């Protein structure tokens, strides 16, 4: 908890049990390797991608169940009265990357969960115009402060609006990550982002 308050992120080993981790990993692998639509037809809500094999899903019901079940734990780590926003799961494959970015308001407090696959570091950084860096976000220099290799079942709780994060192109076969997003229920600025504008968790997005 102290680490989160100081650094705006905290790495937690074994936040999911091996049984839950294995179930979720195999569920999303099966979904990605069959003729089912991994994105459930909602791929346009996360922007346009050139990679024809992009597999990402907003509010998959397994992800939404994790979103609900993990809420008390994220509240405890953040020491905030949080309410669920939405879940998002990606099955990344060779060559895909997560470009340096800050998150939107619906991702005020988040956890990224490693469900399995190959090791793939996630990087965190802050704006620093005086640093020697070739990483930029909105034309501002970014200084990397840490790079973390997650193990299956582990999670990183982080402030996505305030902490720049990214992953370099994956040079292995695949990696499955689920992102659970929450907002501060006591902060008036974020109340409109409850359930990410949906009626409740589990519903498909309306935008």
Language-model segments: residues:
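C-terminal helix/juxtamembrane-tail motif
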Residues: 199-207
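Non-heme Fe(II)/2-oxoglutarate
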Residues: 1-78
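A short coil-to-beta-strand element that immediately follows conserved catalytic motifs
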Residues: 79-88
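Conserved active-site beta-strand element of glycosyltransferases/polysaccharide synthases
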Residues: 91
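Catalytic core of non-heme Fe(II) oxygenases with the double-stranded beta-helix
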Residues: 94-162, 174-178, 185-200
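Short, well-ordered beta-strand micro-motif
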Residues: 11-13, 157, 181
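Catalytic phosphate/metal-binding cores of nucleic-acid and nucleotide-processing enzymes, i.e., regions
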Residues: 3-10, 41, 45, 81, ...
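Short proline/glycine-enriched turn/loop segments at secondary-structure junctions
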Residues: 167-172
